[in-house]
Amino acid sequence: IAIDSTTIKSLTYSNIAKSNPRKNYIEAFTQSNKLSKNEIQDCIIVEQGLVKESMRANIFVRFDNIVITPKIQSNILKGVFRQIIAEYLKAENNYVFKESEISVNDLENADEIVLVNAVIGANLIEKIDCILFPKLENYRAKNHELYKLFNELFNNNLA
């Protein structure tokens, strides 16, 4: 699933080795050349209908006060920033934090989707393919609480 504010694209990752995260990123780097030619910023890796991560970052999805990120498995790189956020959210009383499966269909009902990595910090996702998140006209004006929180954590811990 391509992530971009203007272009609608979808990519399939059929040859990613499930047991080697480094191979995932080699494939992601190869695919990123195709993305840049199509003005797509990133791509979500989906395996058997479940969201794993993006090509460049870990993913966090918020539904009201519940924040979910995919469980770390052998095919997901353990992100430094992901770990900082997970530890913070586990101690934070304002959110219920879960490491759980996220289906592609779950993304359509999200209140907020944020990609994070230790180099770029947090990126708020506004559109995946032709779906705007969430399906509310005032989303851009809405208080993007996770996005702001994650960037604050990034600035305090990694910048």
Segments predicted by a language model, with ranges:
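Helix-start/capping segments and mature chain N-termini
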Residues: 1-159
